[in-house]
Regions:
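Basic, helix-initiating cap at the start of DNA-binding domains
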Residues: 1-72, 89
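Hydrophobic alpha-helical connector segments
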Residues: 102-131, 185
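Short hydrophobic/aromatic patch on the recognition helix
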Residues: 74-84
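C-terminal peripheral helix-coil segments that are non-catalytic and often amphipathic
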Residues: 1-32, 164-168, 172, 202-232
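Amphipathic alpha-helical packing segments from all-alpha helical-bundle domains
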Residues: 132, 145-173
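Short amphipathic alpha-helical segment with a characteristic S/N-K-E followed by hydrophobic residues
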Residues: 48, 63, 86-91, 101-102, ...
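Tryptophan-centric aromatic hotspots in well-structured domains and transmembrane helices
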Residues: 83-84, 151, 155, 201-202
């Protein structure tokens, strides 16, 4: 099913039984941490990621430089390069850290779960830094297979894990039947993710239309239309 809203990534223990992408990825064995090396400073990492999004919003992809990010974050360039060897890796992680604010929380019904995550996802997409970064990544990723792979690993896959957890919540509540075939279930999870994320991104980033509470209700009703028993 669908992911729902989650607390900022710097809070290690999300409230209300929520599950973050980092925790969800760990639960299914997906890689999230980088390799070995000098101990990381969480404060420095956050400052760098914040500075990256700020620079993207102001300068765009073409104007962003590693030196400018280091200066904005108040760290040495060597510190920045030790953590992120390339601009593309840095930008992907800066955006991934925003979407790490989504949380899979059981709100009592599949419809409520979907409505909550769509609302929070839309909020994140309306941020100027998010829009600038995503549009740049989409453009660059179309020309760079390695960047496209990193986008899939750091941004897309963690959110698909949350879709999987939301689906499991619905099954535990008896709203959905248990999965019978893992391959089919995985394919369905991908379709659900693409439908929700793609629709919201297209409406906000391409059409420039707002995502209102009424629109979210109508979208969710349409999404669950083939399953009337899931509608409140």
């Amino acid at each position: 099913m669908a992911p729902t809203t989650r607390q900022p990534a710097e809070q290690p223990h999300p409230p209300d039984g929520g599950t973050t992408p980092a925790a969800a990825a760990a639960a299914v064995g997906a890689p999230h941490a980088r390799g070995k090396g000098r101990p990381r400073s969480a404060a420095a990492d956050q400052a760098i990621l914040d500075a990256t999004r700020e620079a993207l919003a102001e300068l765009g992809w073409g104007g962003l430089t590693m030196g400018d990010v280091a200066q904005r974050a108040g760290v040495a360039k060597t510190t920045l390069y030790r953590r992120w060897p390339s601009k593309s890796e840095l930008v992907v992680d800066a955006i991934a850290s925003l979407f790490d604010q989504l949380e899979c929380t059981d709100r009592g019904s599949l419809q409520a779960d979907i409505e909550a995550v769509v609302a929070r996802f839309a909020e994140l997409l309306t941020l100027p830094e998010t829009q600038a970064a995503l549009l740049a990544l989409f453009a660059e990723g179309s020309r760079d297979p390695q960047l496209r792979l990193r986008i899939r690993e750091r941004i897309v896959q963690p959110q698909k894990v949350l879709v999987e957890l939301g689906r499991a919540n619905a099954q535990a509540r008896g709203e959905m039947d248990p999965d019978r075939d893992p391959a089919t279930a995985d394919e369905e999870i991908g379709i659900i993710f693409d439908t929700i994320a793609g629709t919201v991104e297209h409406r906000l980033l391409v059409s420039g239309e707002p995502v209102t509470a009424d629109w979210i209700r109508r979208f969710t009703t349409l999404l669950l239309g083939p399953f009337p028993g899931l509608l409140r």
